[in-house]
Amino acid sequence: MASRSVSKLVGSATVASLFLATVATGQSRLDVASATAAFDQAHSLCQADEARTWGVTLCGPMLIADPATRAFVSNMDGLDMPLERKGAVFEGRLPDSVPIANTAVRWNGRVWTMLMAPVTTDEPARSILLMHEAWHRVQDQIGLTAANADQPQLATEAGRVSLRLELRALAAALDATDPGQRRQAIEDALTFRAWRYVRFPQAQAAEDTMERHEGIAEYTGRHLSRDDQMTAHLVEHLGRGDRVRQYARSFAYFTGPAYGVLLDSASPDWKVAWDRNEGLPQMLARALGLEIASDDGAFAAAGARYQAATIQAEEAAKAVEQAARIAALRAGLVDGPVLVAPVTGASFSFDPNRVTPLDSLGTVDGVIRAAADWGVLNVEKDGLLSTDWSRLTVAYAGATRTEEGLRGDGWALTLNPEWEATPGARDGDWTIRRREPAAP
């Protein structure tokens, strides 16, 4: 499956996203020829841009890594540690502390664009991916530092209804050939969002944060993909977004490119004039001189144009399912015995389409991997990442000791020699601590 990056270098933590693929250990999906072809294509795409889009070139260090073997091929040598040269490229093996995903990663003296092998050959997905991830490597240079923000509002019935309506209105705006129809659809999209912000006051800052990060990355990928049907493909992409089960970390992949393309039409110099603090929807409203209503009447009138009643019925049914899932997650990850791993400063990778907000406690990731000083915690079934990203919690019931550390239902802990699992704060809980030095 294709991968997308959710967040990259955040403070001292390296964060990446991935859609995990099943592969037998030792079965390589990486070869020099395909990696070289990807490097050449990425170079061609970023060279064609000539730094016009963001004022900096997206060309630079890139590596493609196989998650099964941790082997990689890169287009440049390392700075801190030389790599093995093989023709025009370089080879090596990534340490366990480096997450393998579609991401930007700081390692061996450079900031690299990293891609998971095999890189898709489907177009325009391949070109979009190459430029999306290349943008993440340079985003700090253009004043858009990587950041994360939880989106609990997008796990609620009202939040999901309003977002799905917004996606439909954005698709209609992009698809419209009549300027009046486009303007109306844009106003509708902004109405749905304004209505959501009234009900969830924290949502605007949180959504703006992710759209400046993943949204702009996806916009850049599409903008530089040289796809002659880019708008039509973006409309199809928004249609797929209407069917997403979890929006908490994936919504900006849909809204970001849509608002970016609409801004290209409404205000072609928006990227130059942007002060980086204003949200994309607010910038679009200002460019078009729109006054956006946020009341129930405006929401209902706009919603009637996008089958709001059908969406509301679907989301009411999903809300019942979601409540049952939240109760089960709380029972296993909050009320029951747990292993709590300290993850401040850790490296992460996770799947943005399998993220469930759990009230104020954080987010439950269906798939997540954390690498820290103590070792690696690999979770394939629900790990609770705290809101401040300091703790990763898994259900401890049924866990057993292994030679490497511990194994539980859907997770495995590999401990470095200086660390051990010890009893936690509550009876039945466990945590990870550095071993006490042996007595002399």
Where are the language model's segments positioned?
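Bacterial N-terminal signal peptides
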Residues: 11-21
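N-terminal mature-domain "stem" immediately C-terminal to a signal peptide or N-terminal signal-anchor/transmembrane
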Residues: 27-86
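Catalytic zinc-binding patch centered on the HExxH motif and its immediate surroundings
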Residues: 89-109
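Short pre-active-site segment immediately N-terminal to the catalytic Zn-binding motif
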Residues: 115-129
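Active-site recognition of the HExxH zinc-binding catalytic motif
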Residues: 128-140
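Post-HExxH zinc-binding segment in Zn-dependent metallohydrolases
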Residues: 141-199, 203, 207-233
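Active-site-proximal alpha-helical
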Residues: 201-231, 238-300
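Non-catalytic terminal regions of proteins
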Residues: 272-440
